[in-house]
């Protein structure tokens, strides 16, 4: 994450909360690089972070942590394309991330298998190049929404892919308004 929107390099901390109880977040460990504008996914065993930026530079590093054990991250692999402000989500098998900036806005979608380490691979394309988009998944479908086209035009478009097979996105409808910077999008580990 990043403590603010400046180019200060982000932070390397990982925190967690216990969903079954109330209370403040606690320290889980550290990423091995500072990170900001990253995307994340998880299955019941492993959480994975596809890095966005490390200071002013874009980073293609993918981190992993084992959910059951507190501790620092380790290397999972590399993104095919270094990107920031991308939409990312996962089901219990696969993580997908799409769009983002390099800093030029891009449309490509990549995937990785959560159970095994390794580099991400191409998996399809969004309908248009955009950054600052959100994503969410269930066991079958990954939905990407909102974002910013070039030049700084916001969109309310929703589009999806079949998470098992990939491919180019299909229109899924529209949000009620044009939105950007969909930080805080998430996923459920209940699938």
Regions found by a protein language model. Give the residues of each.
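Polar, enzyme-active/binding microenvironments
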Residues: 1-191
């Amino acid at each position: 994450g990043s403590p603010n929107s400046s180019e200060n390099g982000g932070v390397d901390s990982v925190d967690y909360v216990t969903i079954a109880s109330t209370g403040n977040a606690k320290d889980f460990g550290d990423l091995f690089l500072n990170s900001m504008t990253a995307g994340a996914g998880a299955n019941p065993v492993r959480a994975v972070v596809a890095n966005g930026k490390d200071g002013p530079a874009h980073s293609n590093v993918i981190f992993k942590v084992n959910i059951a054990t507190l501790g620092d991250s380790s290397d999972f692999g590399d993104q095919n394309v270094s990107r920031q402000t991308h939409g990312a989500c996962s089901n219990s098998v696969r993580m997908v991330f799409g769009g983002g900036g390099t800093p030029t806005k891009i449309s490509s979608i990549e995937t990785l298998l959560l159970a095994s380490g390794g580099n991400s691979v191409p998996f399809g394309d969004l309908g248009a190049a955009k950054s600052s988009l959100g994503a969410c998944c269930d066991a079958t479908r990954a939905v990407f929404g909102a974002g910013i086209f070039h030049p700084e035009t916001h969109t309310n478009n929703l589009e999806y892919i079949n998470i098992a097979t990939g491919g180019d996105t299909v229109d899924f409808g529209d949000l009620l308004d044009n939105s950007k910077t969909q930080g805080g999008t998430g996923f459920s580990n209940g699938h």
